[in-house]
Amino acid sequence: KIQEGKGYLVPELRGIFDSWYDQKLKTEIYPQYQDVLTIKAEEIKAIPKGTAYERLQKMVGISQIKAVIEKALNYNKLQKIYREKGIKTGRPVMHMVFTGNPGTAKTTVARLLAQIMQDNGLLSRGHLVEVGRSDLVGKYVGWTAKCVKEKFKEAKGGVLFIDEAYSLLDNRAGSYGDEAINTIVQEMENHREELVVIFAGYPEKMEEFIQKNPGLRSRIAFHVSFPDYNELELCQIAQLMGKEKGIEFTQ
């Protein structure tokens, strides 16, 4: 319930709306949702499986992506509970944007994310297909859409990682880059339950890229920031790397 005269952050308002709308679905729009009222929070907390998840948890920093994965796994378990109660639901959009400077583990995390989703039933294959502009934009008219569709086909059941996605922008209407972006948006919708698309790059450039494409923006579920490591985190990373190789560092 929104209190008069109180200020709210955008995430808080979204949470209030989600809670209200969920209650509306259960009690007024779809009476069959009444049974879901008995589901307790602890019942939908997933127990993640797989070595990829364990590796991710050991990584230094990246708390935001860890929270995103927890949310995705919990929602997947909730979907299973819904199905057991006879409630038909489609898988929510899982496409993401990773922003950060080089060396902040974006590609490494994307690869682990693909495997985690496969280990826990969200994806069928769990592989990573990494592409850039040269993989998506054709040399001649009519080639670009075909290139994009081939990469989506290759990534089916896994994660399509589009690095430096803003390089697709040509700043002129009707360009091959525009054709690539429009086809990507179409394929994201057509295969929303079959793969996850991750757009990655520098924060400022990625923000500009997303803002210029409303259709793309509406299909992104999570925006994950990868901040630069501080001195303490770099020391922790060095210690972990040394431990894996049997090397012990002294003070």
Name the predicted role of every residue range.
Residues 1-10, 27-29, 120-125, 208-211, ...:
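Conserved C-terminal "switch" segment of AAA+ ATPases
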Residues 51-94:
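Pre-Walker A (pre-P-loop) alpha-helix and adjacent loop at the N terminus of AAA/AAA+ ATPase modules
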Residues 87-126, 150-154, 220:
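Walker A/P-loop
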Residues 96, 129-131, 160-161, 197:
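Hydrophobic positions in the central parallel beta-sheet of the AAA+
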Residues 125-155, 178:
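Short glycine-rich substrate-engagement loop in P-loop NTPases that contacts/grips substrate
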Residues 132, 155-174:
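Conserved P-loop NTPase "ATPase switch" module shared by AAA+ and STAND
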Residues 166-172, 181-227, 232-235, 243-245:
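Canonical AAA+ ATPase core
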